[in-house]
Amino acid sequence: MKIGVLGAGQLGRMLALSAYHLGHQMRFLALSEEDPSSILGKTYINNHSDVIELFSDDYDVVTYESENTDVSIVNKVRKKSKVYPSESSLHLTQHRGREKNLLSKLNIPCAPFKMVNSLLELKSAVELIGLPAILKTAKDGYDGKGQFLIKSES
């Protein structure tokens, strides 16, 4: 099976290494030839709109390597084939608030949280949740990026 992956970073590399053990071939839509996965399969460099068309014709199934994938690219690729997970799942996971609210709604246990947009809201959240606490950005955080440990109120 040819698996298309939107993105060619370290997560795509780990996916490819596992897929090869199962006999699959990989195709990547990358930002650069230097991306970590680009040596592990046919790679299309996303530097013009025609590339997405070419990439879209060269796989049996497509996925993306992280929640930071551009939803507009997923929408273009899905015009030719299904993308798993769906773009609605991608949209949900691109914002921690949407993600946490869904988990809470489904009664799936998760750490206490409060969405904040100001210092006043942060102080209120700390009073409610307690310290120590971790302040996280709502978007674009990964591997510790966008996370701040709060140990005290000062």
Predicted regions and their residues:
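Active-site nucleotide/adenylate-binding loops and adjacent lid/helix of ATP-dependent enzymes
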Residues: 94-154
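ATP-binding N-terminal substructure of ATP-dependent carboxylate-amine bond-forming enzymes
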Residues: 1-94, 98, 120
